[in-house]
Regions:
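A generic secondary-structure signal for well-formed alpha-helical elements
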Residues: 2-5, 9, 77-82, 98-99, ...
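Acidic carboxylate motifs that coordinate Ca2+ or other divalent cations, activating on Asp/Glu
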Residues: 162
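Histidine-centered active-site microenvironments of extracellular/periplasmic hydrolases
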Residues: 2-59, 63-66
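Long, internal low-complexity/basic segments
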Residues: 168-219
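C-terminal cap/loop subdomain of S1 sulfatases and analogous C-terminal strand-loop tails that border
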Residues: 22-28, 68-71, 76-159, 208-210
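Active-site rim elements
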Residues: 33, 54-65, 77-82, 165-172
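Alpha-helical packing segments of well-folded alpha/beta enzyme cores
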Residues: 1, 70, 178-182
Length: 219
């Protein structure tokens, strides 16, 4: 692809983003494919090249990013407003060799394995919702990884002491702030379908003012 861009004269006019939807365990923890909470199943490549921002070419940024940052980044590159419903942040300050005014201090991912267990449990919902407990969420900071399971179990790894994710901690002074951070993240990123839509007396409602197409639609 890169050769084709160079041969066609588009290399200096094309933004390139190389990433993936998941990683691969490749034998780590005795496992393969993508399963569980381990970072090696979720830590993916992220390479972004803006041909206009040569000052940052070749730079390695050691900060947390997530796939939700891709769309805001592309919008910002194209001088388009970032949709209000986007959960991510634009990477454009890093691409210009600058520090953004705000950035996340942790990465998050979730894993849901209900589909693999559908044949195991009888369909006795709503009284016994076994499948609803077959998921997990991870809050990964610079020093720790907190794993919350939907059935109430949890794990907390001290990855500063042991980057291989084999050393657990149960220290409340460590675990409680991580659980609070996990809850805050979930609350801030809950489903926002129709959020910000005001139903008014006698009318169908209106969207918030920062939705780009609102003024064009109402005119």
């Amino acid at each position: 692809v890169w050769d084709a861009l160079e041969e066609s004269g588009q290399w200096e006019n094309t933004v390139i983003i190389v990433t993936a939807d998941h990683a691969e365990l490749l034998g780590d923890h005795g496992l393969k494919e993508k399963v569980g909470y381990w970072e090696t199943s979720q830590h993916i490549v992220s390479i972004v090249r803006d041909p206009r921002k040569t000052q940052a070419h070749g730079t390695v940024v050691r900060a947390f990013t997530e796939n939700v940052d891709i769309m805001p980044t592309l919008c910002d590159m194209l001088d388009q407003p970032v949709p209000a419903q986007c959960d991510g942040l634009p990477l454009t300050p890093y691409l210009a060799g600058e520090e953004p005014p705000f950035w996340r201090d942790a990465a998050h991912w979730e894993y849901d394995w209900r589909s693999t267990l559908i044949p195991v449990y009888p369909h006795d919902t709503p009284w016994k919702r076994h499948l609803d407990s077959m998921s997990l969420a991870v809050h990964r900071s610079d020093t720790h990884a907190y794993v919350q399971f939907a059935d109430g179990d949890w794990l907390c790894f001290d990855i500063e002491a042991d980057p291989t994710w084999r050393t657990l901690t149960t220290d409340p002074a460590v675990v409680l702030p991580l659980t609070q951070a996990m809850l805050q993240w979930r609350m801030k990123n809950t489903n926002r379908t129709l959020s910000g839509f005001l139903v008014e007396d006698g009318g169908t409602g209106r969207w918030p003012t920062d939705v780009a197409w609102r003024s064009a639609t109402s005119e």
